[in-house]
């Protein structure tokens, strides 16, 4: 792993902040936009960690954040941050029974989140969902167009909710992580179920991480043309900066201008109290911040 020397303003040497930036100090040079920023995609959890995140978000002009917060933490976050935070429905990823946690229990949670004011329901369908399915005894258990997901989408539709989904992953992951095509398929294979879901359910959809394909603006252009209920978010900042930065500036500007109103801003900011603790991490998100 590349290790860079800490910047002079670094708070501490931290592998999750390889440039050693003091983000509060960096915010002082951020331009005033004249309007508030809405972050449509974040994961704000942890009583301590969220208290660190909130002033930094405000310093950069973020006035509202839509967060995939654990159901059990929603009351605390709402009490603490009020109208500055809204919630996106997620399953219990720590549930020991994948089939139940992403199936029947998720139906219950969708309704409970909705009662708490959530307007968006998330369907996580990165290729790793196949591993979850195999663990539960059914490779296609969490397929986006499978019976379990369709039942959940029907519920979301009845409740008047928007759907968000994570489909595919970076090209680099398919070159290094998902090399078993018999198991994971090709990257493009993951878009057929998405297209079927978009055609079947007409509510607005948000495909996270620029639809999982910032590497190919032409593909995204055709996807948006074909599905008028589809929107994309810009979350997963490092991925977006790396891949969108490869395109000529005029192509990016042209794409964003053409699809103004259907591209929404998101960061994929993750906060969890695990980040503040030494030692092994229980969750994947906790581990990512220290790797």
Residue ranges and their predicted role:
Residues 50-51, 78, 99-100, 175-197, ...:
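Distinct, well-ordered alpha-helical segments
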Residues 37-42, 64-67, 85-90, 121-123, ...:
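Hydrophobic faces of well-ordered beta-strands that scaffold small-molecule active sites
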Residues 1-87, 104:
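An N-terminally biased module of ancient metal coordination in phosphate/nucleic-acid-related enzymes
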Residues 71-185, 231-238:
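Active-site gating/metal-coordination segments in enzymes
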Residues 2-18, 34, 84, 129-140, ...:
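Active-site gating loops and adjacent loop-to-helix segments of metal-dependent hydrolytic enzymes
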Residues 29-31, 54-59, 74-86, 108-118, ...:
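Acidic (Asp/Glu)-rich catalytic clusters
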Residues 43-50, 65-74, 94-105, 131, ...:
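Acidic-and-aromatic substrate-binding clefts and catalytic sites of carbohydrate-active enzymes
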Residues 48, 204-291:
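H/E-rich (His + Asp/Glu) clusters that bind or coordinate divalent metals
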């Amino acid at each position: 792993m590349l290790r860079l020397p800490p910047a002079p303003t670094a708070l501490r040497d931290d592998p999750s902040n390889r440039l050693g930036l003091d983000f509060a100090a960096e915010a002082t040079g951020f331009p005033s936009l004249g309007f508030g920023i809405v972050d449509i995609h974040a994961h704000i959890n942890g009583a301590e960690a969220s208290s660190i995140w909130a002033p930094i978000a405000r310093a950069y002009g973020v006035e509202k954040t839509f967060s995939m917060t654990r159901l059990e933490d929603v009351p605390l976050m709402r009490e603490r941050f009020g109208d500055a935070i809204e919630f996106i429905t997620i399953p219990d990823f720590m549930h020991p029974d994948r089939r139940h946690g992403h199936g029947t229990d998720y139906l219950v949670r969708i309704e409970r989140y909705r009662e708490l004011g959530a307007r968006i329901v998330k369907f996580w369908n990165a290729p790793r969902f196949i591993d979850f399915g195999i663990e539960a005894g059914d490779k296609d258990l969490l397929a986006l167009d499978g019976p379990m997901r369709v039942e959940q989408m029907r519920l979301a539709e009845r409740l008047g909710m928007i759907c968000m989904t994570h489909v595919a992953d970076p090209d680099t992951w398919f070159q290094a992580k998902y090399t078993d095509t018999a198991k994971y398929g090709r990257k493009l294979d993951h878009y057929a179920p998405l297209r079927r879901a978009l055609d079947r359910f007409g509510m607005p959809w948000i495909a996270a991480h620029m639809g999982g394909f910032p590497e190919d603006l032409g593909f995204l252009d055709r996807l948006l043309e074909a599905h008028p209920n589809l929107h994309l978010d810009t979350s997963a900042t490092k991925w977006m900066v790396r891949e969108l930065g490869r395109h000529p500036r005029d192509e990016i500007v042209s794409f964003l201008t053409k699809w103004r109103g259907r591209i929404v801003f998101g960061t994929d900011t993750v906060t969890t109290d695990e980040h503040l603790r030494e030692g092994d991490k229980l969750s994947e998100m906790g581990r990512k911040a220290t790797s």
